[in-house]
Amino acid sequence: MAAKFEVGSVYTGKVTGLQAYGAFVALDEETQGLVHISEVTHGFVKDINEHLSVGDEVQVKVLAVDEEKGKISLSIRATQAAPEKKESKPRKPKAAQVSEEASTPQGFNTLKDKLEEWIEMSNRKDLIKK
């Protein structure tokens, strides 16, 4: 099998079956491989049936050949040019808003200080349930 189909080579195949996880492509009369759903096209593929049908002729690139298991991993996406990415505007970071009473000049609170504050708050009469 490895002598017939080299990793990195591109072949023409015929889609013989579709599953939720990918498409089976016949490379010749006795050999077929699997194109995983993530390798069908650039971008997200929700339903493989929207992109492929049984009987379609497709160009596939061999990603891996597993001699022991007799499996060939294929990719249609690797034979296609990647779409151009839109230039996005750089985002401005949001300024952090820290209340002055909740932090020390260094920017953090010690547990000791917060504990004393919590005890004072719990002793306030307007918070005590009747």
Curated annotation (Swiss-Prot):
Pfam families (UniProt xref): S1 (PF00575)
Locations listed in the record: Cytoplasm
GO cellular component: cytoplasm
Record keyword Cytoplasm present: yes
Biased composition (Polar residues): 100-109
Tagged with keyword Cytoplasm: yes
SMART domains xrefs: S1 (SM00316)
Domain S1 motif: residue ranges: 8-77
Example GO molecular function: nucleic acid binding
Sequence segments annotated as region (Disordered): 76-109
Annotated keywords: Cytoplasm, Stress response
Induction (UniProt): By heat shock, salt stress, oxidative stress, glucose limitation and oxygen limitation.
Quaternary structure annotation from Swiss-Prot or TrEMBL: Found in association with the 30S subunit of the ribosome.
Record-given protein name: General stress protein 13
Name of encoding gene: yugI
